Amino acid sequence: MSNRLVILGTNEYQNPLIVRAKELGYETHVFGWKTGAIGESTADVYHDVNIMDYETLWKEVQKVDPCGVASIASELAMHPMNYLLRKLGIPCNSLETEQIATNKYLMRCAMRDAGIDGPRFTLVEEDFSKEVLKNFEYPLIIKPVDLSSSRGVMKINSEVELDEAIEYALGWSKTKQAILEEFIEGPEYSGESISYDGKYKLLVVTEKSTTGAPHFVETGHKQPANLSPELFAKVEKTLYRAFASMGIKYGAVHPEFRITKEGRICFMEIGARMGGDCIGSDLVPISSGYDYMGMVISIGCGKKPSFEKIQKPKTARIKYIITKQDLLEFEKMKEEHPEKIKRQSEMKELSDNPILKSADRAGYYITAE
């Protein structure tokens, strides 16, 4: 069998996968539109192909004759990745699971039907009737069913804010559909997990920080989260039930959830992919010691993942630069503890505009201690 690995995507969040695959001895064939992104030069072989043009993509991939296909942290790339895996005869998640994992309404329905705890919710389209909400309690939160990265998300404190929020969310949605839910109070977490042949392992829990209402753009992450062993076990059990309800069997899984003061574990959404924002690629190996990207590569090649730890676990953090104070803290860290900084992004100019989505952040840095 060849050692040629197809990787879909070329941006900075995909680049750690390219680097890790090369470290593991794979010849990396990276596919994506030519934009000058870092992965184009990091790849052993770069292919200027639109990954959403399935016919052309498959034609070019056949020429490579790869041992597998991988991609991380991208819902967009997840669809062509699974398409290629099916064509190559490598086990992967079903088309139904793929659809559920990329539609927040279908996801809620699957978990509700499996008896998993969650808020009241309803589908919102352009002909939405407020009569549906007569049994709902404010505050609510609305999200496009088909987007991630905080795009189109808004908290609604009262009926007065409802029309504006619906217009905002539907304006972002490609399908003109949104999900409206009762808002769950409590700290936010994600559980970085791996699945193989329908068996699951929670590698580490992430403690998340956001801008809060109304848009909840993530400002930083810490691993591992400060959970008691008893609560970790409860989270683990709840996560596995939720994964099974969606039919997830292969690859990385990124569930986002809140834990209420009463101890309820309520999901916000679950991605059948590695978490973005460097959570899976950078933080998980630092905090857990596991080779998360190596696991994803193995599964994408049809092989069982290894759970051997490759390094001693440390506390891992990522901090996003949004304000002048964030920038000052970063400069102080560089001056006083440069050894703690594991990676930093290019920095954009700080903006005075409101932070509405993840792309509005100026940059980030990752630390280990």
Outline where the language-model segments fall.
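Peripheral (often C-terminal) accessory segments that flank ATP-dependent C-N-forming ligase machineries
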Residues: D113, K130, M295-E369
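A short, structured active-site edge motif that brings together acidic residues
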Residues: S94-Y105
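Phosphate-binding core of ATP-grasp and ATP-grasp-like enzymes
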Residues: A169-Q177, E182-A225, A233-F267, G271-G280, ...
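Active-site nucleotide/adenylate-binding loops and adjacent lid/helix of ATP-dependent enzymes
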Residues: N103-I179, E185, D197, A225-K237, ...
